[in-house]
Amino acid sequence: MPRSLKKGPFVDDHLIKKVDAQNEAGSKNVIKTWSRRSMIIPAMLGHTIAVHNGKTHIPVFVTESMVGHKLGEFSPTRTFRGHVKDDRKSKRR
């Protein structure tokens, strides 16, 4: 179920402070965060945010189409290595 509109979007305080500080300074440095639950707001447009996936930080460049989504949606946590080919010769041995 989506979040209520009267509550507004959730963004961690430390993340919004970093974004606002960079907007005032006019810099576009990479912002490292562990907050996958934070929603992308219009103030983040044009910034690169490194989102933690449990192992490393994956850089995510925020575009206009991402507004309203959560940061964790753009940082996959699971790696798919593919299915093993069905090799009949190796099964006989």
UniProtKB/Swiss-Prot annotation:
Basic and acidic residues composition bias: residue spans: 83-93
Example GO biological process: ribosomal small subunit assembly
InterPro entries: Ribosomal_uS19, Ribosomal_uS19_bac-type, Ribosomal_uS19_CS, Ribosomal_uS19_SF
GO cellular component entries: cytoplasm; small ribosomal subunit
Key words, A-Z: Ribonucleoprotein, Ribosomal protein, RNA-binding, rRNA-binding
Coiled coil residues, start to end: none
Pfam family, one: Ribosomal_S19
Domain of life where this protein originates: Bacteria
GO MF annotations, alphabetized: rRNA binding; structural constituent of ribosome
Region (Disordered): 73-93
Gene3D superfamilies linked: 30s Ribosomal Protein S19, Chain A (3.30.860.10)
HAMAP family documented for this protein: Ribosomal_uS19
Biological role: Protein S19 forms a complex with S13 that binds strongly to the 16S ribosomal RNA.
Family affiliation: Belongs to the universal ribosomal protein uS19 family.
Name under which the protein is recorded: Small ribosomal subunit protein uS19
Organism (species): Streptomyces avermitilis (strain ATCC 31267 / DSM 46492 / JCM 5070 / NBRC 14893 / NCIMB 12804 / NRRL 8165 / MA-4680)
Lineage: Bacteria, Bacillati, Actinomycetota, Actinomycetes, Kitasatosporales
Gene (UniProt): rpsS
